[in-house]
Curated annotation (Swiss-Prot):
BP-aspect Gene Ontology terms: viral tail assembly
Protein family according to the UniProt entry: Belongs to the Mulikevirus tape measure protein family.
GO terms for MF: calcium ion binding
Species annotation: Lactococcus phage c2
Record bears the keyword Protein biosynthesis: no
Role summary: Serves as a base for tail tube protein polymerization and acts as a template for tail length determination.
Keyword Iron part of the UniProt annotation: no
InterPro entries assigned to the protein according to its UniProt record, in alphabetical order: EF-hand-dom_pair, EF_Hand_1_Ca_BS, EF_hand_dom, Tape_meas_N
Binding site for Ca(2+): D499, N501, D503, K505, E510
Protein name, entry field: Probable tape measure protein
Coiled coil: 9-113
Gene that produces this protein: l10
The EF-hand domain, residue ranges: 271-290, 361-380, 496-521
Length: 706
C-alpha cells in the first residue's frame, strides 16, 4: 500500500510585482528540502510566476507616467498662456488628472511590497518577515492552516461548489476575500474626505441593511474605494452612490464584476471633471451605462431648462399633451392595439384601439400603463422622441456631439448621480432579479461569513495573522489530510453525477444512487479507523493533541449522521479500545456515548496529566487559559455546520448555503416552476433563505421550503 503524502502548497500572491523573486524561489526550495529531512512523505510545492523583470517593467512604466505628467503640466501652462479655448484647457486638465492618477497607482504598486505593512496577506507576510521569520516559510504556515482546516469542511465547500459557482478552493477564496476587504478598508479610510469615520459610516449603512446587502459587503467596499480614489466624497456620499449602482445593477440582473467595471468608468469621469468618450465607452459596456446615460440627458436638460424630464412626463400624460402620432413614430403603428389588449385584460371588458386613443387624449393612461406594455425603456425612449424637436435639448442622437462640446460637466454629472441615487433608493428593497444573482449573493454571503468567523476565531484565541507557528502547520497538515480523505470520498461520489446532463437538474434515481455511494464511502472510512492508525496519528500530532480530540469528536458526529441517514441504529461493538482509554472514555461506551458531550479539558479524567503537570499543560495550551490555538469551526459558520457536514451528501436534507435543482429563473413560466433551495441551518443562512423565498414568492414562483 502506497504511503500517504502530505502536500503543502506554498504560494505568494502579490497581485503585482515581487521585490526579490529569486529570494522567494530559494525560500520555496529550502522549505522543500527541510520537509524531506523531517518527513520523507512530505512534499512541498510552490513557484514564483513574477520574476525580477516585473519590477523593472513597472519601474519603466512609472518613469514614463511621470514624464507624461511633466509634459502635460507644461502643455497646460502653455495653453493657458496662449489663449487656448476653454474646451482645449478642460481636455488637457482631464488628461493631466488621469496621468497623475496612473503615476500614483504605479508608484504605490512599487512601494507596496517593500514598505507597506498590514496590507492584506502580503502585508502580513512582510510583517512576519521583519520580525525575524522566513518569508515563504511563514506564509506556507498561514496558507496551510487555512487549507488544512478547510479540509475539515470538505463536505460543506465541496457540496456547494456547483450550486454557487465557487470555482476555486475554499482556502484561496477566504484569503482573497481577506485581502480585498483589508485593501478596501485601507483605501476607503485614507481617501474618504472624513477618513476612518467615513469608513465606519459607509459600512454602518451596510450592516443595517438586509442579509443580501450584507453578503456583498466586500464588493461594496471595493466599489466605494474606487469612487473615493477619484473624487472627494464622504462615507455617506460614497455609500449613496455605491448603493445606487448596486440596486440598479441588481434590478438589471447584472453581477458584481459588471458593476465594478461601470463604477471604474464612472469614477474616472467624475475624477476628471468632464465626461469623455473613453470613460463613457467604459460605462456603456453594460445596461448600467444606458441607465446612467438617461440620467445624464435628464440632468443636462434640467440645467439648461430645455426639453422634458422624467418627473414632468406623468403630468404631461395626465394633461393629454402626449400625441398619438408621437407614440406611433416611437413605438410603431400598432402601439394602440398593444395597449388595447393590455387594458382589456386589466379591466375585464373589451377596449378598442379608438378607446385607447381617447383615454390618451383624456389623460387616463399613466406611465406605468405604458411601461407594462413597452418595458422599462418606455420613459427614456419617449422623452428622447419628445426632446428631439426641442431646441438645444440633449437627446440620444446628439449625445456624443454634446459630450465632445463639454456639456457633461462636473455639475451635470453630480446632478445625474443624484437622479441615479433616487432611482437606486426605489429599487434597493426589491433584491435580486435572476437566479444567477441569487447564486452569486449566496456565494458572497458564504465568503463574507467565513471571513467574519475567521477573524472572530483568531481574536477569541488571542492569535493574529503574524503569530501562526509550527504547531498550527503540523496540526493542519495531519488533521487536514485525514479529514480530506473522508471528505473527498464522500463528496466525490456525489459530484460525479451533479449536473450530468448540463441542464442543472438531477433525477431522483441518480441522486439516490449517488447518496448511497457517498454514505457507503463515509461508513467504510470510519470502519477503518483503529488503534494502530490513530496511535501513529497521535505521535505525529504532538502539540496539537486537543485538535485531534476535536477531529475525533467531529468524525464521530459525522459517523452518527451517516447512520441516521441510513435509518439504522448500528453501534460500534465493544469498548472504544486503547485509544478511547487514552482520551478518557468510559470503558464500555459507544462512540455516541463517548462524544455526545465529552471534552477532555473540562473532564474529571485527566489521562495525559495536564492538570498535574503544569509544564506540559503550558506547553500544549500556551498562556491562553485553556483556549484552543485553532478551531476547526472557524470557517464553517458554527459548530453545527461541521457536525452536520455529512448532510451535504443528502440533497433532501440541508446542504450548505444553497443548492438548486433547476436552471435559471426568467426563461420559463415562473408560476409553474418548482424551485428548491437548501440553506445551512445557521442564523445567517436562515435569514438569507427567508429573503430569497419572499422575493421569489412575490414573483409567483412556487417553492418547497425545507
Amino acid at each position: 500500500m502506497a504511503k500517504e503524502k502530505y502536500v503543502i502548497q506554498a504560494e505568494l500572491e502579490t497581485k503585482g510585482v515581487l521585490s526579490n523573486a529569486r529570494e522567494a524561489q530559494r525560500e520555496i526550495n529550502n522549505i522543500g528540502r527541510l520537509a524531506k529531512e523531517t518527513n520523507k512523505n512530505a512534499q512541498i510545492t510552490g513557484s514564483v510566476t513574477m520574476k525580477d523583470k516585473g519590477i523593472k517593467e513597472t519601474q519603466r512604466a512609472l518613469n514614463l507616467a511621470k514624464q507624461n505628467v511633466d509634459n502635460l503640466t507644461k502643455a497646460l501652462a502653455n495653453a493657458k498662456m496662449s489663449g487656448a479655448t476653454q474646451k482645449q484647457v478642460q481636455a488637457l486638465e482631464s488628461q493631466l488628472v488621469k496621468a497623475q492618477t496612473q503615476a500614483t497607482r504605479l508608484s504605490t504598486e512599487l512601494a507596496k511590497v517593500g514598505s507597506e505593512k498590514g496590507t492584506g496577506l502580503s502585508g502580513a507576510v512582510d510583517k512576519m518577515k521583519s520580525a525575524g521569520g522566513s518569508l515563504l516559510g511563514t506564509f506556507s504556515k498561514v496558507g496551510n492552516v487555512v487549507s488544512g482546516i478547510s479540509s475539515a469542511i470538505g463536505l460543506v465547500s465541496g457540496g456547494i461548489s456547483k450550486a454557487v459557482d465557487l470555482t476555486s478552493g475554499f482556502a484561496n477564496t477566504l484569503m482573497d476575500t481577506y485581502d480585498k476587504q483589508i485593501q478596501a478598508q485601507k483605501t476607503l479610510s485614507t481617501t474618504l474626505s472624513d477618513g476612518a469615520k467615513g469608513y465606519e459610516q459607509f459600512n454602518g449603512h451596510i450592516d443595517k441593511g438586509n442579509s443580501l446587502l450584507k453578503s456583498q459587503k466586500t464588493d461594496l467596499n471595493e466599489l466605494g474605494a474606487t469612487i473615493s480614489s477619484y473624487m472627494k466624497v464622504s462615507g455617506d456620499e460614497a455609500f449613496k452612490t455605491v448603493n445606487a449602482i448596486n440596486a440598479v445593477g441588481d434590478s438589471l440582473g447584472l453581477g458584481m464584476d459588471t458593476q465594478k467595471q461601470f463604477t471604474y468608468g464612472l469614477a474616472q469621469a467624475l475624477g476628471s471633471g468632464t465626461l469623455h468618450a473613453q470613460d463613457f465607452n467604459q460605462m456603456m459596456q453594460s445596461a448600467l451605462g444606458a441607465q446612467f446615460r438617461d440620467m445624464l440627458i435628464q440632468a443636462a436638460n434640467e440645467m439648461q431648462n430645455v426639453g422634458m424630464t422624467a418627473e414632468q412626463l406623468p403630468d404631461a400624460l395626465k394633461k393629454g399633451k402626449v400625441e398619438a402620432d408621437l407614440l406611433a413614430n416611437t413605438f410603431g403603428d400598432n402601439w394602440a392595439s398593444k395597449m388595447a389588449k393590455a387594458q382589456t385584460s386589466l379591466k375585464g371588458i373589451e377596449v378598442s384601439t379608438g378607446g385607447v386613443k381617447r383615454m390618451l387624449k383624456d389623460g387616463q393612461l399613466s406611465v406605468q400603463d405604458f411601461t407594462n406594455v413597452f418595458g422599462d425603456g418606455f420613459t427614456s425612449s419617449l422623452l428622447n422622441a419628445m426632446n428631439t424637436t426641442s431646441d438645444g435639448a440633449v437627446t440620444m442622437e446628439n449625445f456624443k456631439d454634446k459630450m465632445e462640446d463639454g456639456v457633461f460637466s462636473t455639475e451635470v454629472m453630480n446632478r445625474a448621480i443624484e437622479l441615479f441615487q433616487q432611482k437606486g433608493e426605489k429599487l434597493a428593497s426589491s433584491g435580486p432579479s435572476t437566479w444567477a444573482q441569487i447564486r452569486e449573493m449566496i456565494s458572497n454571503g458564504f465568503n463574507t461569513s467565513a471571513l467574519d468567523g475567521f477573524r472572530k476565531g483568531l481574536g477569541d484565541t488571542g492569535l493574529d495573522m503574524s503569530s501562526m507557528g509550527n504547531n498550527a502547520t503540523e496540526m493542519s497538515s495531519i488533521v487536514g489530510s485525514k479529514l480530506g480523505q473522508m471528505a473527498g470520498q464522500a463528496v466525490g461520489a456525489l459530484t460525479k453525477i451533479i449536473d450530468k446532463n448540463k441542464d442543472g437538474k438531477v433525477s431522483n434515481e441518480e441522486m439516490e444512487g449517488a447518496v448511497n455511494d457517498a454514505k457507503d464511502a463515509v461508513t467504510n472510512f470510519f470502519n477503518k479507523i483503529n488503534f494502530t492508525s490513530i496511535q501513529g496519528f497521535l505521535g505525529k500530532i504532538g502539540n496539537a493533541i486537543d485538535e485531534l480530540v476535536r477531529f475525533y469528536n467531529w468524525a464521530n458526529d459525522a459517523y452518527g449522521a451517516v447512520q441516521n441517514l441510513l435509518s439504522a441504529s448500528r453501534q460500534v461493538g465493544g469498548n472504544t479500545g486503547l485509544i478511547g482509554k487514552a482520551l478518557g472514555f468510559r470503558k464500555n461506551s459507544t462512540w455516541g456515548d463517548a462524544f455526545s458531550d465529552f471534552h477532555w479539558l473540562t473532564s474529571n479524567i485527566d489521562p495525559l496529566g495536564l492538570k498535574e503537570n503544569q509544564g506540559l499543560g503550558q506547553k500544549l495550551l500556551g498562556s491562553r487559559n485553556g483556549q484552543i490555538p485553532l478551531d476547526l469551526q472557524f470557517f464553517a459558520g458554527g459548530r453545527e455546520a461541521i457536525n452536520k457536514a455529512v448532510d451535504a451528501v443528502q440533497p433532501y436534507a440541508r446542504a450548505s448555503k444553497g443548492t438548486t435543482a433547476t436552471s435559471s429563473i426568467g426563461t420559463q413560466d415562473n408560476s409553474k416552476q418548482d424551485i428548491k433551495i437548501y440553506v445551512q441551518s445557521s442564523a445567517d443562512g436562515q435569514r438569507i433563505a427567508k429573503e430569497i423565498y419572499n422575493k421569489l414568492e412575490r414573483n409567483g414562483v412556487k417553492l418547497n421550503k425545507r
